[in-house]
Amino acid sequence: MRTLWIMAVLLVGVEGSLIEFAKMILEETKRLPFPYYTTYGCYCGWGGQGQPKDATDRCCFVHDCCYGKLSNCKPKTDRYSYSRKSGVIICGEGTPCEKQICECDKAAAVCFRENLRTYKKRYMAYPDLLCKKPAEKC
């Protein structure tokens, strides 16, 4: 199990502080980020294009938009701290960038949990070539 967790942390294909975001996703959904969220739909994973395929993919679209609104931050690499109080993610102290990145990741992890019932396995490892429709604006 430890090897699987390390692999998930290393391979998770979402932007942000990979360790913290992967941990949040696992805690919220009880699913490993890899394979469930790394190549899902048109937006989960590196980059994104086209129209989100469903509510889970929309979580990733909104997450990408959230990162896009951060100025002078490095969401792919900046580490942050968070804790839980009564099961709720509480973003910790840190720089304004760290706090904003944490809030983006928190919103995505909670969104994944809220949409577990509509998650569709057919969108796992979804080919980019099927994401050709014009992209939405954030």
From Swiss-Prot:
High level of membrane cholesterol content reduces cytolytic activity, whereas low level of membrane cholesterol content increases cytolytic activity. Expressed by the venom gland. Residues 1-16 form the signal peptide. SMART domains: PA2c (SM00085). Its cofactor is Ca(2+). InterPro entries: PLipase_A2 (IPR001211), PLipase_A2_Asp_AS (IPR033112), PLipase_A2_dom (IPR016090), PLipase_A2_dom_sf (IPR036444), PLipase_A2_His_AS (IPR033113). It catalyses: a 1,2-diacyl-sn-glycero-3-phosphocholine + H2O = a 1-acyl-sn-glycero-3-phosphocholine + a fatty acid + H(+). This is Basic phospholipase A2 myotoxin I. It comes from Bothrops asper (Terciopelo). Binds 1 Ca(2+) ion. GO terms for biological process: arachidonate secretion; defense response to bacterium; lipid catabolic process; negative regulation of T cell proliferation; phospholipid metabolic process. Keywords: Antibiotic, Antimicrobial, Calcium, Disulfide bond, Hydrolase, Lipid degradation, Lipid metabolism, Metal-binding, Myotoxin, Secreted, Signal, Toxin. Disulfide bonds join 42-131, 44-60, 59-111, 65-138, 66-104, 73-97, 91-102.
